[in-house]
Amino acid sequence: MKISILLMFLWGLSCALPVTRYQNNESEDSEEWKGHLAQAPTPPLESSESSEGSKVSSEEQANEDPSDSTQSEEGLGSDDHQYIYRLAGGFSRSTGKGGDDKDDDEDDSGDDTFGDDDSGPGPKDRQEGGNSRLGSDEDSDDTIQASEESAPQGQDSAQDTTSESRELDNEDRVDSKPEGGDSTQESESEEHWVGGGSDGESSHGDGSELDDEGMQSDDPESIRSERGNSRMNSAGMKSKESGENSEQANTQDSGGSQLLEHPSRKIFRKSRISEEDDRSELDDNNTMEEVKSDSTENSNSRDTGLSQPRRDSKGDSQEDSKENLSQEESQNVDGPSSESSQEANLSSQENSSESQEEVVSESRGDNPDPTTSYVEDQEDSDSSEEDSSHTLSHSKSESREEQADSESSESLNFSEESPESPEDENSSSQEGLQSHSSSAESQSEESHSEEDDSDSQDSSRSKEDSNSTESKSSSEEDGQLKNIEIESRKLTVDAYHNKPIGDQDDNDCQDGY
C-alpha cells in the first residue's frame, strides 16, 4: 500500500509539471503566432510542402541512425512535453516565410486579392499536414514515404530558383525544428506502444505463475509479483503521460495506456489474494503445531490423572459447561485465589484437550463443521500459551452459551403461542431443564476417559439448537408473509368493490361528473 501511494503521488507531480510548462510555452507560442499572422497569412501549398519535408527528414533520420532516436527517447523524461511546441514554432516561422513570398507576389502583380482569398484554409492545411503523420503512423508508413519523396524534389527546385538568403535561412529553420520534434515524437510513440506490450506480457506471466502455483507460493513469488506491479505502474505512468501530452493526435497511445491500466488492477488483486493465502497457510501450520504439542502434554496429564468410569455423554457435556460457569462465578465472588486459579488451569487444560480432539475428529470426517472448530482451535492455542487469557476466552464462550440458552427460552415462549413445531419445543425444553438441573453438579470432574463422545454430543446439541432456532424463525417468517399477502388481497378486493357507481373504467377520472 505504501508503494502504491508513493507511485500515485509521483504520478500526480509528473502530471502537474507538464501542465505548468504547457501554459507558459503556450502563452509564448501564442504571442509569436499572433505576431506572424499579423504580418500576412500563408498559402496552403507551401506550408504543406514544408510539413512534408519535415516528415521525410525525420523518417530518414530515424532510419539511418537509431542511436539518436534511442537517445531522444531517454531524454523524453524532461523533453517529451516540448516537441509539440517545437512544431508550433516551426509552423510560425514558415508562416513568416510565406508572408515574405506573398509580399513579393503582391509587389509584382499589384493585386491584394491573392492574400485575402488564401487566408482561410492556411492554418487548417497546416494542422492536417502535422496531424497526418501522427494518425497514420502504424498503418501506412511505406506509402507515405513513397508519396513524400517526390515532394522534397519539387521543394529543392523551388529553393534553387529563389535567390534571397533570408528565405533560405527560414527554410533551414523550418527543416531543423520539426525534424527534432517529429523524430522524438515518432520514437516516443513507437517505443511506448512496443514497450507497453512487453511490460504487459511480462506482468501477465507473473500473474499466471501466481495462479498456477496457488497455495504453494513462497516469499520469492510475492517479491516477483511486487516487481511486476512496479513495472506495470511505471509503464502505466509513462503511457498516461504520453497520452496527456499528445492528446491532440495520439489516440493509439491513449488506448494503449487504457489497456495497461486494467492488467495492473488485476495483478494487484492477484498479489493480494496470494499474500492472504500465504498468511492463512502460515496460521494453519502454527495452529496444527500448537495442537500437536498441547495434545502430547494433555495426554501426559491424563495418564497421571484419575480415570473415571464412563457416564452418559449428555451428562458429561452438561457438567463441562456448568463447571466453567461455576468457576467464573467463584472467581467473580471470591476474587483471584490460589484454589480458583488451580481449578481454572485444570479446566482450561481439559477444555483445550477436548477442542484438540474435536479438531482431530473433524479432520477424520466425524464432524463436518469446520468454522466452529477453527474458532475453538484459535482460542485453545491462545489458552495453551497464557492461562489467564484462556479463562477470559472461555468466559466469553460461556457468556455466548448463556445468551443462546436465553434465546432458546424466548423461542420456547414464542413457540408455545404458535404450536407449529412440537418436536422442537420438546427437545429445546428438555435441554433447558437439563441445563438448569446440571448446575448442582459443578466441579465434579477433572479428567475424562472418553472425551470424543462428549465432544460429539456437544456438537450435536449445538447443531440441534441451531436447527430448532432456524426452523422456528422460518416458520415465523412464513406466517408473517402469509398475513401480509392476505391483507394485501383484502385491500385490493375492498378497493375493487368500493368503487363509485359512475366510475365504470379503470382510469382515475369518474364518469359521473
Swiss-Prot record:
For this chain the motif Cell attachment site maps to: 364-366
Q: Which domain of life is it from?
A: Eukaryota
Q: Which UniProt key words apply to this protein?
A: Biomineralization, Cytoplasm, Extracellular matrix, Glycoprotein, Nucleus, Phosphoprotein, Secreted, Signal
The effect annotated for D117N is: In one individual with tumoral calcinosis
Q: Please give the tissue specificity annotation from the record for this chain.
A: Expressed in tooth particularly in odontoblast, ameloblast and cementoblast.
Does the keyword Glycoprotein belong to this entry?
Answer: yes
A biological process (GO) of this protein is: regulation of enamel mineralization
According to its UniProt record, where is this protein mainly located?
nucleus
Q: State the compartments where it is located.
A: Nucleus; Cytoplasm; Secreted, Extracellular space, Extracellular matrix
UniProt signal peptide: 1-16
Relate the protein's function as given in its record.
May have a dual function during osteoblast differentiation. In the nucleus of undifferentiated osteoblasts, unphosphorylated form acts as a transcriptional component for activation of osteoblast-specific genes like osteocalcin. During the osteoblast to osteocyte transition phase it is phosphorylated and exported into the extracellular matrix, where it regulates nucleation of hydroxyapatite.
Q: What is this protein called?
A: Dentin matrix acidic phosphoprotein 1
Q: Which organism is it from?
A: Homo sapiens (Human)
Supply the gene name.
DMP1
